Amino acid sequence: MRRQLRSRRAPAFPYGYRYRLDDQDEMNHNYLADEEEEAEEEAQVMMVPGLEEEEEEEEGKEEEEEREEEEGQGQSTGNAWWRKLQIVNEYLWDPEKRMSLARTGQSRSLILVIYFFFYASLAAVITLFIYMLFLAISPYMPTFTEQVKPPGVMIRPFAHSLNFNFNVSEPETWQRYVISLNGFLQGYNDSLQEEMNIDCPPGQYFIQDGDEDEDKKACQFKRSFLKNCSGLEDPTFGYSTGQPCILLKMNRIVGFRPEFGDPVKVSCKVQKGDENDIRSINYYPESASFDLRYYPYYGKLTHVNYTSPLVAMHFTDVVKNQEVPVQCQLKGKGIVNDVINDRFVGRIIFTLNIET
């Protein structure tokens, strides 16, 4: 701020005193010297820019900036998207720094090399563990068989929901069952069995010693063993006369042998209702059992030509024009056929509805 000069007056002398003239002259001389000194100081102060002028300049600059901002607001809306596009373009490719997506080619190459060695090491470790696992596991014989369930069963021909519903006088209703049985029994043709397999003595296990990777021989199960249900004598398997044939087989279990040398037998009856609804069933083979010569099974890698034995049920006298629930069970030592929550362990349930 500007300094203000203080005004000075000649000192007033008290009334009644008298001073000498030389003293008065000296005081006046000093007064004039002080006035000159203060005038010089004021001149020096006036030469320095004042604070008020600086403030005025700053206010002027602020007003100019505000005007520029107001003028730029109209253009900023139109240029906003253009600036964003420029930013995106520079992010995708910056020609000055030669960077794409904020990375140089060298950094990307380094990242690829790191990931390559990382995943290569990971794959090598996994491959090593899998290799060690396969060394410990035999491909020919299961390592753990304690939890293997007793054999389940399945039937042919295939029927939706296990309901055999057909009309004797309408071939189109039962022809699909005949086709299914013919296709299933192709592998049991006598000529094919005689060519691939050997004739084994019945009533005893066919145990084959040797290395576990050695090919095993299989016993013959000819289609002709099924007699009236073979499709050789009656190509319709009894469906044209209302006496259908249904084939049953046990699922394969590696190393399974019926206990105590007793063959597993098959027995069918009415599940619920009048037992007289099924008055006659013929079984083929006549023993209604799976002969011991077809056991044990050594697995698909070595027992290549193995043919599962079958038991055919020929329902020769069944009540007509109503549904008959049928249950067929396996019976033998060590066979389980009463599991409530599994309908196919040791038994199977299906329905016959033969219309005339």
UniProtKB/Swiss-Prot annotation:
Perinuclear space topological domain: 131-356
Pfam family, one: Na_K-ATPase
Comp. bias (Acidic residues): 33-43, 51-72
Membrane topology, from the record: Single-pass type II membrane protein
Keyword vocabulary terms for this entry: Membrane, Nucleus, Signal-anchor, Transcription, Transcription regulation, Transmembrane, Transmembrane helix
Residue spans crossing the bilayer: 110-130
InterPro entries assigned: Na/K_ATPase_sub_beta, Na/K_ATPase_sub_beta_sf
One of the protein's GO biological processes: potassium ion transport
Side Nuclear, residues: 1-109
Location in or out of the cell: Nucleus inner membrane
Region (Disordered): 32-77
Annotated GO CC locations: chromatin; nuclear envelope; nuclear inner membrane; nucleus; sodium:potassium-exchanging ATPase complex
Tissue-by-tissue expression: Expressed in perinatal myocytes (at protein level). Expressed during postnatal development in skeletal muscle and heart.
Purpose: May act as a transcriptional coregulator during muscle development through its interaction with SNW1. Has lost its ancestral function as a Na,K-ATPase beta-subunit.
Subunit: Does not associate with known Na,K-ATPase alpha-subunits. Associates with a SMAD7-transcriptional complex. Interacts with SNW1 and TOR1AIP1.
Protein name (record): Protein ATP1B4
